[in-house]
Amino acid sequence: MALFVTSLNSGSNGNCYYIGNGTDAVLIDVGISCRETEKRMMQLGLSIKTVKAIFVSHEHTDHIKGVSTLANKYKLPVYITDATAKQGPGLIRHLSQAFKAEVPVTIGELLVTAFVKEHDAADP
């Protein structure tokens, strides 16, 4: 099955990346509004119904701005490290799932493995 990866937005005004296989998808960061995320996905012919989870790379606003709204609206689990969750302003706790770098997470037919990166954040 083919894997589709695209940037819905990138830069200091917000980061959001879609990774999917036609059946299952995840978003990496939602640093743009829920409405803008939905709009950009629709423009690309991507269904929000395939999104099964959100992964948060770190707590900076340009990576988390729309996470809570989108996760609440679609009841999506949010995979986030404990350190990032503690630093992220206004991140929802009831949909949060803790994860760690180098420990794979299975989302449908996708296997997501995070890795540590140097950055000025709690746990990038």
Where are these regions (language model features)?
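Short, structured coil segments at secondary-structure junctions
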Residues: 1, 73-74, 91-94
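Generic preference for hydrophobic
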Residues: 5, 54, 78, 112-114
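Conserved beta-strand hairpin/beta-sheet module of binuclear metal-dependent hydrolase folds
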Residues: 1-44
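Short beta->alpha connector loops
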Residues: 10-12, 32-34, 60-61, 117-121
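Divalent metal-coordination and catalytic microenvironments
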Residues: 19, 29, 58, 112, ...
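Active-site metal-binding motif and surrounding structural segment of the metallo-beta-lactamase
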Residues: 34-83
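Metallo-beta-lactamase
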Residues: 80-124
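A generic local structural motif
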Residues: 13-14, 39-43, 64-65, 98-100, ...
